[in-house]
């Protein structure tokens, strides 16, 4: 039996070797399985979709590769079969700026202004201990603005001075103490939406990069939403626009990227209609460039060394009905007896009202991966606790309607890696081996991702034109 297994393993090894040897030669492929484009884009979230549309607008041919069966990344939407209404339980809002408005207009998707009141009046509760809390929402004060203004280069990425200021590498709780940040301000910085991990231990550099001047602009009320409260509509329209230059449910299984521009890139991609060879002048990586996502791209030793530092954390979201909770309220999980009343993780972050009566969406923060079953069990227990605490007139059994795993979420690297020049090295990879990186490695939020991608386009176009 062992000899049979060994023989099978040897055959597999030879098969993989054969793939590596001639997989990138067009002569080895049926012409119907070869795709030739100016640019191949891998990752169909906010970054990749925007890049594909804008490159088409500039007259370039593209192919977009996405492993899921849809575009949109963290823009996830539940469609209620009873009312036809939509519940966004990932991306919520966009900055009201020209790039955002132009992109929505380009894809014939309506926008509308938003009142933050639609997110519900906050109710603070300790989900674990089962008690309502008399808390006051923090307010960002001038003390935070003064600190943020020290680091203007963090608004649009991480083009850092050398040496990197050591203050930026402090855990946020230590930065708060060192600069005597007011309690109300500190609480506000810890209450920013959809942040993963232990909020006190996040490096200051990531707080300022996330809670930057653009986000402050949004928090002042300068936000827009899809007029139908369906953030996935933008991406459905993008699917229609990009066909047939779109490969959904597809994965890169091998890559060859040369250093000379004229040699371009070649990717072997598994698709629902068979394996394809993509031959392109340039590659844009719009997905999280963590090592596990990039191993099949034929990394050189320098790329491997740089990308190996990147990690993301778990974050989850879902939609639930039959909660028995009062409409128009946002039920937030805090703790009675911890620093800044932060709830321990893993735990549900909040239950928020949606635009569909009776449906709430929730988020769940965890330091390590957690199963959907455990998350929904804990969410169910929290809802039953809230029913009791709020004297709900009905106590139905919650029904879970949708679930999404957003990992790897909010990409980061260690303080030591930053100190040793990680971001200089990462920016140095732009254009290296005809490959470009965009997305949430540099900024958070779709609005900034689109803006940063737009800023990169002239360099990418120049590379295409000179290939």
Curated annotation (Swiss-Prot):
Glycans are attached at residues 96, 134, 337, 391, 451. Its EC number is 1.21.-.-. It comes from the Eukaryota. Pathway: Secondary metabolite biosynthesis. InterPro entries: FAD/NAD-bd_sf (IPR036188), Zeta_carotene_desat/Oxidored (IPR050464). GO terms for molecular function: oxidoreductase activity. Its cofactor is FAD. The keyword Signal applies. Keywords: FAD, Flavoprotein, Glycoprotein, Oxidoreductase, Signal. It is an enzyme of class 1 (oxidoreductase). It holds the Pfam family NAD_binding_8. Residues 1-20 form the signal peptide. Induction: Deletion of the conserved eukaryotic csnE deneddylase subunit of the COP9 signalosome leading to defect in protein degradation results in the activation of the silenced dba gene cluster. Expression is positively regulated by the dba cluster specific transcription factors dbaA and dbaG. Expression is also controlled by the transcription factor flbB. PANTHER family: FMN REDUCTASE LOT6, PUTATIVE (AFU_ORTHOLOGUE AFUA_7G06600)-RELATED, PROTOPORPHYRINOGEN OXIDASE. FAD-dependent oxidoreductase; part of the gene cluster that mediates the biosynthesis of the antibiotic 2,4-dihydroxy-3-methyl-6-(2-oxopropyl)benzaldehyde (DHMBA) and its derivatives. The direct non-reducing polyketide synthase dbaI product is 2,4-dihydroxy-3-methyl-6-(2-oxopropyl)benzaldehyde (DHMBA), produced by condensation of one acetyl-CoA starter unit with 4 malonyl-CoA units and one methylation step. The FAD-dependent monooxygenase dbaH is responsible for the synthesis of yellow pigments derived from the oxidation of DHMBA. The roles of dbaB, C, E and F have still to be determined. Belongs to the beta-cyclopiazonate dehydrogenase family. This is FAD-dependent oxidoreductase dbaF. It comes from Emericella nidulans (strain FGSC A4 / ATCC 38163 / CBS 112.46 / NRRL 194 / M139) (Aspergillus nidulans). The gene is dbaF.
